[in-house]
């Protein structure tokens, strides 16, 4: 199932990618608060257990992998991404240890992030990016983007892309792009986890998959 992300935002003039995480935390808090205060009847009808939290804990991708391997005696199969089972296990671990339904996984490998993701200056093999997990499922992806022209060109070349094919995109960097970043969130995924629906198709008005294009 390819879930359309219908909630996106971009931020300019940021200090670092953690500002984006802070705004996302506030946005999720606002959503949960609205459900609690304005849709209590529907929440009760669907037996929804709303999460309660002040802050969302975070863990670096590499550390998350090692924690899962150690805690559950599980061999690391994919060093570049979290498998669905690993998303479930890291969520379970943070629920048990920190009583949190949410967890930010940060610093994903360069190999699994797009050409515009900013590399971590302390470890260029990883990026200043993150996923937000909720009850075992990734519901959002975001991070800091590259704003420097030369750095962006170099990153494109490293990913076997031709900078000439991105001339209009690079013009923005050449003439002044502020430090920026953003996030895309799957509201249907969030809804699926809130109502404990294992299949996200049932929380999408018009789901799309390999066998369904209409309506």
What are these regions (language model features)?
Residues 26-135, 158-171, 175-176:
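Metal-assisted phosphate- and nucleotidyl-transfer catalytic regions
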Residues 2-16, 23, 100-215:
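TRNA-recognition modules of translation machinery and tRNA-sensing kinases, especially anticodon-binding
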